[in-house]
């Protein structure tokens, strides 16, 4: 098919149709300083070697997570990914695979999706899982919308300690629906404020554990109260490794479990792509309203076991107004990486990994708490916790960087204008005793 560019007349007609005077008006939300007035002055006729050197020089200005003591978390975690994972997902059968519309030629892809779903369901203590979402935030947002459809109610209550990005994603989706989201204060460690918001109009309650500050929550009581009012409970997690040690959401009464799977099989990747996990209880109402795709196991006409897309109520398959989401193909490769890594770990390996993460975090918390002026905020945590500093956390992080330490996420970056002296810190199996010692010494130096 030939490429036929739009004429000036075509462009004017399109701009007139949407009521915009010029193409520049389409980009008014982009700051002037970030816009290009013309072409970048790039060197021409460079060899491949010269281009590689130039790009390497540019990338060297970044501080790689592997090149410094790294304690940044808040939704994205540095874990070791076995070489086997990257090797297998680069096989052409997986790397170039498309949505398995034709099961007879897509059994490998469909089986891995089925295995992924099985692992997610087991991990979360749920009965059914879909074939993944874009990331944890979109999984959370879709869960809120699903709960509204199932209960036919329009009020969602979210704990303020749910990751702010997850809250914003949910609010964005709710903005174009009848759903209203009530967000409680993030400061209290208990769930009393959430419970107080639950009434007969509540569709769902959304709670994260471990939450954005690293605090662990027992969902049993809030689940009981929510269910008495006819509301669903959505449990959120940003650190999937925690489920190797912490009680699964399904075992604490949650109806839907959603979260980020990046910490298993997927690198930091400059913030994406990641893999959203989505699971729920075995209820026909839930399954029919679950977003995305579900791979199922069946028997063909010859009695052979096979795999197919059992449910796929996304907008590419059915009418847009009847679709439950618009999840697409590219999420599949990350879910494959997750499945391979989880298979390599096994149940015992995941528990060992989770325990190592927790022990490392405990050692770090002890070391930092010993620094004069530093107070540990958390009573409970998995591999992430928050400390209270005697000075602005944002400034402390910048000072730590000059010591070569990437020392966490200032809470004020997630809650502008609040928690200015609070620093959220994560520790994983990749952190060594030497890293912890360097961090503690550097922190003492900048305070």
From Swiss-Prot:
Highest rank taxon of the organism: Bacteria
BP-aspect Gene Ontology terms: glycine decarboxylation via glycine cleavage system; nucleoside metabolic process
InterPro entries: GcvPA, GDC-P_N, GDC_P, PyrdxlP-dep_Trfase, PyrdxlP-dep_Trfase_major, PyrdxlP-dep_Trfase_small
GO MF annotation terms: glycine dehydrogenase (decarboxylating) activity
Record-linked SUPFAM superfamilies: PLP-dependent transferases
Keywords: Oxidoreductase
EC primary class: oxidoreductase
Reaction(s) catalysed by this chain's protein: N(6)-[(R)-lipoyl]-L-lysyl-[glycine-cleavage complex H protein] + glycine + H(+) = N(6)-[(R)-S(8)-aminomethyldihydrolipoyl]-L-lysyl-[glycine-cleavage complex H protein] + CO2
EC number: 1.4.4.2
Quaternary structure note: The glycine cleavage system is composed of four proteins: P, T, L and H. In this organism, the P 'protein' is a heterodimer of two subunits.
Chain's role: The glycine cleavage system catalyzes the degradation of glycine. The P protein binds the alpha-amino group of glycine through its pyridoxal phosphate cofactor; CO(2) is released and the remaining methylamine moiety is then transferred to the lipoamide cofactor of the H protein.
NCBIfam families: PRK00451.1
Family membership noted in the UniProt record: Belongs to the GcvP family. N-terminal subunit subfamily.
Protein name in UniProt: Probable glycine dehydrogenase (decarboxylating) subunit 1
Chain's gene name: gcvPA
